Amino acid sequence: MDFSDYHRRAPVTLALVALNIVFFLWTEVNGSSEDIQNMYRWGAMYGPAITEDHEYWRLVTAAFLHFGISHIANNMFLLLLMGDRLERALGHVKYLILYLVSAVGANLFSMVLDLRLDPETFCRTVSAGASGAVFGVIGGLLWAVVRNRGRLEDLSARQMMIFAGLSFYYGLTAAGVDSKAHFGGLVTGFVMCMFLYRPKRRGNWAEVWQKVI
């Protein structure tokens, strides 16, 4: 990937990365990014705080907080890797809308699933991270690639499906990863892109399927 003019191609992606880094440094300076109480204080996800105390803003703020340096490094690398392509495809404003709605959708999906299926986890889990929103970007790219006759710039439908599958598999097998939020973000981003993306060229589904397989 050529990063020489990244700031012109994807200013929103760079701004999101910068915001995440600023929030990370803030939580480190004012406590620790790996301290659960400190993260809760600055806006991490906690189900009962939303359902009982109506602190709905946590659905957004949690997406800008990270537990430790490796957590933010992994998420920001993926965002830089994927974000510029989708930002160029959608435009800056639509891309930002998709990112933020995916963050909310990811956190909401995870919270509701825990509330319905695992009340114990719902009551004791504090979570944070941009990965739900990043998976929204991946979901958006999946739709954009498929809708654009199986290719978007240097990305093919097959590449995107393999990448999405491997990323989701890593989340399922790694400890402490909220795979429910990943899935919620992926689906939210995919659906949002169905409404926001207007391809320059269109192809029939048989042609797209041939490129996938």
Give the positions of each predicted feature:
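A detector for small-residue-rich transmembrane helices and their helix-helix packing motifs
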Residues: M1-I213
